[in-house]
């Protein structure tokens, strides 16, 4: 009888330990903390387009740049939505006056090709139709 009771206590302790370990995974993500966002997310795409328009507007380059690839993208719910983006951008063959950058090819001549990694932080309040570039750092 004592052996059976010991097994039940041991089994209950093991189940509690497994529950605590599995439950801690859900608790590690804090409310309001940045979370990964899918690259195809509509809000992310708007934020990225806005960040690139601001980057090109501030750039002294004769040519426009556009995103080569998204390295990482996170979304944080604050009093709006903050997008934290790390992207690789490249110089295109299109002058700044061009409208549609997606159809612009990247320079392939070594002296003209320029690739840079940038971090953009974009703050969006979609229900007020407001968007602002909070941070733009490129290396």
UniProtKB/Swiss-Prot annotation:
Keyword Transcription: no
Entry GO MF terms: cysteine-type endopeptidase inhibitor activity
Keywords: Disulfide bond, Phosphoprotein, Protease inhibitor, Secreted, Signal, Thiol protease inhibitor
Signal peptide: 1-23
Primary residence: secreted
Taxonomy, superkingdom: Eukaryota
Paired cysteines (S-S): 94-104, 118-138
Site description Reactive site, residues in chain: 32
Location of the protein in the cell: Secreted
Motif position, Secondary area of contact: 76-80
Assigned GO CC terms: cytoplasm; extracellular space; vesicle
Phosphoserine sites (modified residues): 103
Known function: This protein binds tightly to and inhibits a variety of thiol proteases including ficin, papain, and cathepsins B, C, H, and L. Although isolated from egg white, it is also present in serum.
PANTHER family: CYSTATIN
Family named by the database record: Belongs to the cystatin family.
Name this protein carries in UniProt: Cystatin
Source taxonomy: Eukaryota, Metazoa, Chordata, Craniata, Vertebrata
């Amino acid at each position: 009888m004592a052996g059976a009771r010991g097994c039940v206590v041991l089994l209950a302790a093991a189940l509690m330990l497994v529950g605590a370990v599995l439950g801690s995974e859900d608790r590690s993500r804090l409310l309001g903390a940045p979370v990964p966002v899918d690259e195809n997310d509509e809000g992310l795409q708007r934020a990225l387009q806005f960040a690139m328009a601001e980057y090109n507007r501030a750039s002294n380059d004769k040519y426009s740049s556009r995103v080569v690839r998204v390295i990482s993208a996170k979304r944080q719910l604050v009093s709006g939505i903050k997008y934290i983006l790390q992207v690789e951008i490249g110089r295109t063959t299109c002058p700044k006056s061009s409208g549609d950058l997606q159809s612009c090819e990247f320079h392939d001549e070594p002296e003209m090709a320029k690739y840079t990694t940038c971090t953009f932080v974009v703050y969006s309040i979609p229900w007020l139709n407001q968007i602002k570039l909070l941070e733009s750092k490129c290396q």
